[in-house]
């Protein structure tokens, strides 16, 4: 299940992985997913909920987490527009199994292109490391949770274990992002001033 209002990059990765999208209406006061409509949209085939914390507004995570727990659903978050937002003292983007953040132009941090995914699931993290790099084993740690690496650097340099993409960040993007992190609090403060104006 996905919210009906977002950017295409919220939806395309789900579709590219072969999952069926089902759109859920929004709450007009928050522009986030309507919690009542969310629960009504759940079927026996529903596997996950992709939330978008739109324009600095965190979702109603207490209610949505209960729904996900009751129905055995995975919660994912697109937090591209809400870096620094919090719900009950916890940062938006850290409630779901994965939280995604964009570093494209006009977002809180800009590295020209790219983004950040966060998770506390180590196995999933290892899958993401491989997928971002063509499905290679090269960038996996020696104690990988998804693949037993051989003690042969040549072999691992050319071993692909799954379909993947070429979405590794460039060093210049990382350097830009590190410098902007130092200014993140002031960026957020200015965005909040702009929202009130």
Where are these regions (language model features)?
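PLP-dependent aminotransferase-like
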Residues: 1-70, 74-79, 86
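Active-site region of PLP-dependent enzymes
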Residues: 82-88, 95-197
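Short, hinge-like loop/turn segments at secondary-structure boundaries
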Residues: 39-41, 67, 91-95, 117
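A generic hydrophobic-helix recognition signal that picks specific residues
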Residues: 46, 70-72, 90, 114, ...
């Amino acid at each position: 299940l996905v919210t009906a209002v977002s950017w295409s990059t919220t939806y395309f990765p789900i579709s590219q992985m072969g999952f069926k999208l089902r759109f859920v209406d929004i709450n007009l006061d928050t522009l986030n997913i309507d919690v009542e409509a969310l629960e009504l949209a759940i079927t026996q085939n529903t596997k996950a909920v992709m939330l978008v914390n739109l324009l600095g507004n965190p979702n109603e995570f207490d209610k949505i987490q209960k729904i996900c727990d009751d129905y055995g659903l995975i919660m994912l978050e697109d937090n591209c527009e809400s870096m620094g937002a919090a719900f009950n003292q916890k940062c938006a983007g850290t409630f779901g199994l994965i939280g995604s953040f964009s570093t494209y132009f006009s977002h809180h941090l800009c590295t020209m292109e790219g983004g950040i995914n966060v998770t506390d699931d180590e196995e999933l993290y290892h899958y993401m490391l491989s997928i971002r790099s063509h499905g290679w084993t090269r960038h996996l740690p020696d104690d990988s949770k998804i693949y037993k690496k051989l003690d042969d650097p040549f072999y691992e340099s050319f071993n692909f274990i799954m379909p993947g993409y070429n979405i590794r960040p460039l060093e210049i993007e990382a350097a830009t992002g590190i410098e902007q992190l130092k200014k993140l609090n002031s960026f957020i403060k200015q965005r909040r001033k702009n929202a009130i104006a």
